[in-house]
């Protein structure tokens, strides 16, 4: 909804056509119908609509924030701008600077308020959005980094992996329980595996990349001894 009400969109280090097709479709819709300008820091490739690349470096974000380029004037003249940042941009060494300085910049110019939020992060996994909603993950909480440091240093004695997990875990003396339907990295190193159905084999509520809760009805029944997640 915010995308459809925006009068300017700035993409930073993301390719919504590949990372979030529905978001990209919404952007294309407003670009075609309302002719709103779309800009990008970084070259995302073919997005199926017109956009202008205003730079490819962190310096270009600095120039925007400090009103040191022509685009800064264009951005500040808009009433409802939207910035969409990709996770890949936040994974850079300058990622924390990018996020914090943009927040300060947008708050200063009242682009973040109860009525409008100009700052958006395009997560690469829908589960990231759900974990943020549950306050299990935050882009600003230092405890997140402490957790990953402890994981890398094998400081945990017990790990419970729920669902498909793409974490790089070097098993040492941890006791690992894996609950899920796919034989991913977590299942390979688990001491105990609790088989559960795939999402197509059980009813459930899921949060998508836009933060919308969607209901899923099972299309088939699980095989073998697999039990639904809530029963486990």
Task: Give the residues covered by each predicted segment.
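Non-catalytic alpha/beta scaffold blocks inside enzyme catalytic domains
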Residues: 1-232
């Amino acid at each position: 909804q915010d995308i459809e009400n925006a009068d300017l969109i700035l993409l930073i280090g993301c390719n919504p056509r590949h990372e979030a097709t529905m978001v990209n479709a919404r952007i294309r819709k407003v670009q075609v119908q309302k002719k709103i300008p779309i800009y990008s820091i970084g070259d995302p490739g073919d997005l199926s609509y017109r956009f202008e690349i205003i730079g490819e470096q962190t310096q270009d974000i600095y120039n925007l924030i400090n009103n040191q380029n022509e685009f800064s004037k264009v951005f500040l003249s808009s009433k409802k701008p939207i910035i969409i940042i990709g996770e890949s941009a936040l994974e850079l060494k300058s990622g924390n600077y990018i996020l914090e300085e943009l927040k300060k910049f947008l708050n200063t110019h009242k682009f973040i308020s109860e009525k409008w939020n100009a700052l958006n992060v395009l997560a690469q996994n829908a589960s990231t959005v759900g974990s943020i909603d549950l306050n299990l993950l935050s882009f600003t909480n230092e405890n997140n980094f402490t957790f990953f440091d402890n994981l890398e240093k094998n400081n945990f004695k017990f790990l419970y992996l729920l669902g498909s997990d793409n974490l790089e875990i070097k098993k040492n003396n941890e006791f690992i329980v894996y609950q899920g339907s796919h034989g991913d990295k977590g299942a390979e190193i688990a001491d105990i595996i609790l088989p559960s159905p795939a999402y197509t084999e059980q009813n459930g509520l899921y949060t998508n990349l836009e933060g919308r809760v969607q209901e899923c009805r099972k299309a088939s029944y699980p095989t073998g001894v697999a039990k639904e997640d809530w029963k486990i």
